[in-house]
């Protein structure tokens, strides 16, 4: 029975480290249709943009997604997209032949308060 103690201790530490990483940092997530719908809903609604978000883009494709648990959830979408000139062009790109670049779009969601905010749009590194 004493041989189980080190194994159980290791499992407990591993669970604690994993939980801490998910609460404090971003974790990769498989993109689902629901995630893409959340991106479209927030990114196409200019009133959902924080006042300091001045970039305006449409997205062609979601390349990957990371999430972070906070007082809700941050979604960091890595997308291919194009700069646009009007708020009517936000969301999915109507012009699939635009000159695209890579962007990171961070959306904050808190489902129990119906909060959905675009907190940043930055060129990807």
UniProtKB/Swiss-Prot annotation:
Keywords from the named record: Glycoprotein, Protease inhibitor, Secreted, Signal, Thiol protease inhibitor, Virulence
Motif segment (Secondary area of contact): 68-72
Cellular component GO terms held in the UniProt record: extracellular region
Coiled-coil region list: none
Keyword Glycoprotein: yes
CDD domains, per database record: CY (cd00042)
Signal peptide: 1-21
PROSITE patterns, A to Z: CYSTATIN
GO biological process terms held by the UniProt record: symbiont-mediated suppression of host innate immune response
Matches recorded under InterPro entries: Cystatin_dom (IPR000010), Cystatin_sf (IPR046350)
Family named by the database record: Belongs to the cystatin family.
Entry function: Secreted effector that interacts with and inhibits the pathogenesis-related papain-like cysteine proteases C14, PIP1 and RCR3 of host plants. Inhibition of host proteases by a pathogen extracellular protease inhibitor forms a specific type of defense-counterdefense mechanism between plants and microbial pathogens.
Protein name: Cystatin-like cysteine protease inhibitor EPIC2B
Species of origin: Phytophthora infestans (strain T30-4) (Potato late blight agent)
């Amino acid at each position: 029975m004493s041989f189980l103690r080190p194994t159980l201790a290791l499992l407990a530490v591993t669970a604690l480290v994993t939980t801490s990483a998910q609460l404090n940092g971003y974790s990769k997530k498989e993109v689902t249709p629901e995630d893409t719908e959340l991106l479209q809903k927030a990114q196409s609604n200019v009133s959902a943009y924080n006042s300091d978000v001045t970039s305006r883009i449409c997205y062609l494709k979601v390349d990957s997604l990371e999430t972070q648990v906070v007082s809700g959830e941050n979604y960091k979408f890595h997308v291919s997209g194009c700069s646009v000139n009007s708020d009517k062009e936000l969301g999915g790109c109507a012009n699939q032949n635009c000159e695209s670049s890579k962007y990171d779009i961070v959306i904050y969601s808190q489902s129990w308060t119906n909060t959905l905010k675009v907190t940043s749009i930055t060129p990807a590194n």
